[in-house]
Amino acid sequence: MEFLRGGAALLQLLLVLSISRCCSTDPDRKVCQGTSNQMTMLDNHYLKMKKMYSGCNVVLENLEITYTQENQDLSFLQSIQEVGGYVLIAMNEVSTIPLVNLRLIRGQNLYEGNFTLLVMSNYQKNPSSPDVYQVGLKQLQLSNLTEILSGGVKVSHNPLLCNVETINWWDIVDKTSNPTMNLIPHAFERQCQKCDHGCVNGSCWAPGPGHCQKFTKLLCAEQCNRRCRGPKPIDCCNEHCAGGCTGPRATDCLACRDFNDDGTCKDTCPPPKIYDIVSHQVVDNPNIKYTFGAACVKECPSNYVVTEGACVRSCSAGMLEVDENGKRSCKPCDGVCPKVCDGIGIGSLSNTIAVNSTNIRSFSNCTKINGDIILNRNSFEGDPHYKIGTMDPEHLWNLTTVKEITGYLVIMWWPENMTSLSVFQNLEIIRGRTTFSRGFSFVVVQVRHLQWLGLRSLKEVSAGNVILKNTLQLRYANTINWRRLFRSEDQSIEYDARTENQTCNNECSEDGCWGPGPTMCVSCLHVDRGGRCVASCNLLQGEPREAQVDGRCVQCHQECLVQTDSLTCYGPGPANCSKSAHFQDGPQCIPRCPHGILGDGDTLIWKYADKMGQCQPCHQNCTQGCSGPGLSGCRGDIVSHSSLAVGLVSGLLITVIVALLIVVLLRRRRIKRKRTIRCLLQEKELVEPLTPSGQAPNQAFLRILKETEFKKDRVLGSGAFGTVYKGLWNPDGENIRIPVAIKVLREATSPKVNQEVLDEAYVMASVDHPHVCRLLGICLTSAVQLVTQLMPYGCLLDYVRQHQERICGQWLLNWCVQIAKGMNYLEERHLVHRDLAARNVLLKNPNHVKITDFGLSKLLTADEKEYQADGGKVPIKWMALESILQWTYTHQSDVWSYGVTVWELMTFGSKPYDGIPAKEIASVLENGERLPQPPICTIEVYMIILKCWMIDPSSRPRFRELVGEFSQMARDPSRYLVIQGNLPSLSDRRLFSRLLSSDDDVVDADEYLLPYKRINRQGSEPCIPPTGHPVRENSITLRNISDPTQNALEKDLDGHEYVNQPGSETSSRLSDIYNPNYEDLTDGWGPVSLSSQEAETNFSRPEYLNTNQNSLPLVSSGSMDDPDYQAGYQAAFLPQTGALTGNGMFLPAAENLEYLGQGGALYTPVR
């Protein structure tokens, strides 16, 4: 059995400055950067690869061996022992890859995110025979490879490769990292030599005893945690070892798993701070070492910075790179940090290959670039494949503020109209922490029209080489002393620039220049004045006066007095003046002496100027300044210490006395008030209000009715708390009857229910609006009874369900307007309804709805904005989200319920959220789900409904806004609602039925309560087809009437639409839709059983005649049910005693057809 043998290899990664090509600090250990080109083929590919890896032992990044030819020598790869990233062997024709000393692949970078070792497509086919392979990889000599720390292996499309299928990869890879293994054998028959008979398990990389696979894990004893050098427990390697070992100690490792500290493998490097057990303090570690790659080093490379014990390429956000004792480190910024931007390949530009039109603006106002700057042909011409447009050369000036580049600067293309790199005129340092190709940090190639560089501020190229190639017109490059810019002896310059006509300005030193003129000098022969080399500074003459400091001309401060025969100043600032122009306070020249300036200890500083112009301090007792020394020079009153003390004591005493007096007076006032309140409470009556609120009194009138005043007819409905009857109310002392609805409470109801009914009565008695149901009176019997107006057509929900095919868009929009008007009235009265739904809206007639059911309503005071409920049964699916979750009710939560009510109307009585349990409604609303768009609604109507369902109550519309929105839509209903079919006119037969079933002495409740308003009842105006009469649905008249919700056609219409129109069309405004719960039209003497002659006889009976014949003109009823709609209506024109028919007869004025199911008042004859 063969195991690893030999002495321990003490791996010392003393990594230094260059990260480009191979460099070394120890003759036996060399480190090189590696590449990340993947499958890209570069110019001079083999030569660049040979120069990169010759003599290299450790590759920091990736080892990429690609595109080698059959006869090329790869023996320079034999020195490589460790790779930090991945190993790529692809597209090669060479027969052998001699990586015989490679022990460890760390896998810090993975190819395609999965693979650490890739061997693929290493062959070339015979052009004449596609199935015959001429050349290709035959031997992969990884003879000492024993460990891959992370990632998997891929071997595919290598038809000539031998022996690799014998390798046991599970001894090499780490199973804990879940490696991806993609091993695809090739079916091509090849002639391979077998492994040496001494190889364990017949595993080898190539024939011969020196190429057997080295096992360091699978054949170890059970006591070994990781690797071993033999089968015994004593042969286990240290836990910090990687790739095997020669002994059990951490110094016997062939490679280190984490960090190498002078030949000892550790998991961390010595930290900057340690705990001192003697002083019990955290002190600096005298043996500190910095983490650099996989090594612990005493000093970071000069072009790297130190932060938290590590060598990094750039500081993190909020940190500034500074130079301390010759070491560059990261410190927190003092104030605002200079703007640091990502370069190509870093951060936001990690997937970008060059500066282009999409990212050039990201470099605006940047001081430092973390990364690289690359400008190539695609930067300016764009890339159609990636949809990158061309870049305007003027945008390059976004780079003019850049002072430092941590990586490299590569220019492979430049605009023809720019002859220099003057956009980088402020660039001071190129760090070269990453390098281009063969280790270059500054590259200018293929820019043939470039005449000079123009990098006048460049002072340092920290690492990497410089190359200026194919720049035939470039001048002045050979005049530059590049050694002045370099920081290492290994750095070099390559250029093929012109050598003629390269005379620098006379003021430039022998270090050369970046271009013509005194502003392009690398260094000045004499002095530098603001970036311009001059012969001398303005020391004794000239303006402004200057001082010479470190070869620079520095302008004197404005407080320095200009001298003629001597220097005006010795440096910048007011402290370096030879003589002050005004006054001098110590070394500082100032325009005036300190006057009341706040100093240390929050004391004011006062000074005066003596005869020499020197500022001297005033006397300590001078509080207003002084003009000279001593107390005599003080300004203002001079107060001695004793008088000052007396004044202070007197002031304090007076303050205490005043405070005591105020406390006594307040206490006496409080005691007096308590006594007054106590006396008032003991009186039987209070003679004056103690805390007047200022609110107006509620002067609503509540009638107390006797049970004998009304009689019940039939049951309209019943519920948990009582029964509702249809009945007639006959007020005492009056010979009239009023149709009413009587709500009778059950006698067994609880006191709480009685209180809730009284609360409802209070609310209903307090409202007075055409679209809000009023309370007529209350009867306080054993079972409380509420008497309200009777709505003949029942609730709106049942109406739209039963008569879906007969309802038109104008009715729907009118109902929306009227409900919004009623709710707007309640909002103005500070009343929150809390139970608005289609079931709680009643129809007086199809053109007039009223809001009812105030069982849950709450009246808010003037300063209340919301009502907090305490539970109970509530209509969850009509409630706003905040009402469901927090039991909070506002006018805006009523807006939500209004939206659900409108949805019910537009869907003709569909159930909201049907099929969803009530307990899930809150989560459904929070997830953004809402009721769907009704089929008849256009998007305009649905958007208004959706606004009512916004989560934020303040985002929902107010009711007054909803009135305006739906009023506008009601003027043009066919534009906003799409409904098939129309509501037909009332037939004469149904009209006869309504007339014959009416009572002669029935009076409308509104007329009885408000007789002075002369309420003219609204008819139920039918929906007429768009081409029918009397009014076209989409006519200009309908769109321009004053209020589309009112039947104001008689007021607003021109007479031309009524020319030659039959009287039956204008008179048949009574709906033939009825509610069987309110009207029973099945009597045997209805219009079905009457002939036309009998009907006419009925109308000719003498009791229908009126001797007081009124000849005044008739007025169309229109929409006169609502007194607010009677704009322009003159009550005097109405008949006071009856209505004239077409045959000269009158109908009694007391006959109210509306409450017997009639849709409107009758003013024209029935033919």
Swiss-Prot record:
Alphabetized InterPro entries for the sequence: Egfr_JX_dom (IPR044912), Furin-like_Cys-rich_dom (IPR006211), Furin_repeat (IPR006212), GF_recep_IV (IPR032778), Growth_fac_rcpt_cys_sf (IPR009030), Kinase-like_dom_sf (IPR011009), Prot_kinase_dom (IPR000719), Protein_kinase_ATP_BS (IPR017441)
Q: Which GO terms describe its biological process?
A: negative regulation of apoptotic process; neurogenesis; positive regulation of epithelial cell proliferation; regulation of signal transduction
Catalytic residues identified in the record: 835
**Chain ranges on the Extracellular side, renumbered to this chain:** 26-642
User: PROSITE patterns recorded for this chain?
Assistant: PROTEIN_KINASE_ATP (PS00107), PROTEIN_KINASE_DOM (PS50011), PROTEIN_KINASE_TYR (PS00109)
Tell me how this protein sits in the membrane.
Single-pass type I membrane protein
Q: Where located?
A: Membrane
Glycosylated position list: 114, 144, 201, 356, 365, 398, 417, 501, 576, 621
A GO cellular component annotation here is:
receptor complex
TM spans (from-to): 643-665
Please give the family membership noted in the entry: Belongs to the protein kinase superfamily. Tyr protein kinase family. EGF receptor subfamily.
Associated pathology? Involved in pigment cells malignant melanomas.
What's this protein's name? Melanoma receptor tyrosine-protein kinase
Species of origin reads Xiphophorus maculatus (Southern platyfish)
Report which gene this protein is encoded by.
Answer: xmrk
